[in-house]
A protein has these predicted regions:
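Extracytoplasmic cell-surface/polysaccharide-interacting catalytic and binding patches
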Residues: 1-49, 142-156
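Extended, low-complexity, intrinsically disordered C-terminal regulatory tails
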Residues: 43-70
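Short, flexible, solvent-exposed loop/turn segments with mixed acidic/basic and small polar residues
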Residues: 68-78, 113-116
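Acidic, His- and aromatic-enriched active-site or binding-groove loops in soluble protein domains
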Residues: 74-93
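Catalytic cores and adjacent binding grooves of peptidoglycan-active enzymes
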Residues: 87-156
Length: 156
């Protein structure tokens, strides 16, 4: 099933962990609708702008999959509203900046990016609806104790 011109349901539900553990990672109709909105408003515009494939490392996650990987069952991934992705050859800070400046999103997190390693980390981006999007923009990093921390992110 196509969610947009270049994105399929199979691509947004793919999970090695789900396959390995025999977990059903099939979304319901509401979650599929949310995935379509995510593709139409975030992933497809990114793909069109850069004219390069977008590699989705994590899209939809069923509740059972969330539990298996230690994620919250209330995460936006479980609602079909979020994806983690990157474009090989495009620095993730550049990709984040373009999204921030050009798209309406709910939350964008530049995850585990290191300024001295332009291709490090990835983008987490979610989409709800024009009236519900918060435009929350964060950076995730590991503190000195190895725990994940978040702080407001403003691109340079």
């Amino acid at each position: 099933m196509k969610l947009s011109k270049n994105f399929s349901l199979k691509e947004l539900t793919a999970s090695h962990t789900a396959e390995r553990k025999g977990i059903n990672n099939n979304p319901n109709d509401d979650q599929i609708t949310a995935l379509q909105k995510l593709c139409e408003n975030i992933l497809q515009p990114v793909r069109d702008h850069y004219a390069s494939p977008v590699t989705v490392s994590s899209g939809f996650r069923s509740e059972e999959l969330c539990v298996a990987i230690g994620s919250s069952v209330n995460s936006q991934h479980a609602k079909g509203q979020a994806a983690d992705f990157e474009i090989f050859g495009v620095p993730n800070a550049e990709l984040a900046k373009w999204i921030i400046e050009n798209l309406d999103y709910d939350q964008l997190i530049l995850e585990f990016h290191k300024t001295d390693e332009p291709n490090s980390g990835w983008i987490h981006c979610s989409y709800k609806s024009p009236s519900d999007n918060r435009k929350s923009t964060l950076r995730a990093f590991r503190n000195d104790q190895g725990k994940t921390q978040y702080e407001e992110y403003k691109p340079e």
